[in-house]
């Protein structure tokens, strides 16, 4: 496993994974937030590279991505930003990036820049398993975790997807589980059990986890919880101090 990411999961009983959009609401905010990351209860930070057609994102994150893109944030500016602050950040940073961006940049060039900017893992939500082998191998050679996404499907397919993975598995939990319906919770528990049956990698649950109540409820079933939309909403305040304080409330035990 990726050393830095695996260390986090080895050191902590439960891991908090957060998400921001690079350059939203501004480049200055993103830089300042990253410099204050150690003051938050986030253990691993996903950073979204703005993209014009973010298929896996909801309205709020898509809008944030659009605003950042319109402001001139590109893959290069994201790399430049991260390179400028990487020596002051102690927590693992993970890219959430759409494959078209990686392909357009050039896979080898993209990975080289990831190494230089301190990226420890990559999530590519629109990359089919059948096409993931090449990039997962190249990432592994550069000590960058390829973090696979798995959703409810056959155990055999989950096993194949997980076999390419490193760092942790991103389990898509948008099963209506943030409510109180017992049937949905049972589906979630069965799904997580299936994932754990076929892989020794830690499992983190994302999609639909928005409140502290959600975080507390889902923590008991997985190794990590991922919060995206709520954190992006907080960053829209353009106030780093407020964002840090509210994130800590969000992940409060």
List the predicted regions and their residue ranges.
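Active-site beta->alpha loop and helix N-cap motifs at the rims of alpha/beta catalytic domains
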Residues: 45, 49-51, 60-125, 245
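C-terminal helical cap(s) of enzyme catalytic domains, especially alpha/beta-barrels
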Residues: 57-67, 229-253
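Catalytic beta/alpha-barrel core
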Residues: 70-72, 118-131, 145-153, 159, ...
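Glycine-rich phosphate-binding active-site loops on the catalytic face of alpha/beta enzymes
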Residues: 44-54, 119-123, 127-131, 171-180, ...
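Catalytic cores of alpha/beta
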Residues: 27-37, 153-163, 205, 209-225
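N-terminal amphipathic alpha-helix/helix-capping segment at the start of soluble metabolic enzymes
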Residues: 1-20, 86
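Hydrophobic faces of well-ordered beta-strands that scaffold small-molecule active sites
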Residues: 16-20, 45-47, 93-97, 122-124, ...
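Glycine/Thr-rich beta-alpha phosphate-binding loop at enzyme active sites
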Residues: 61, 71, 158-194
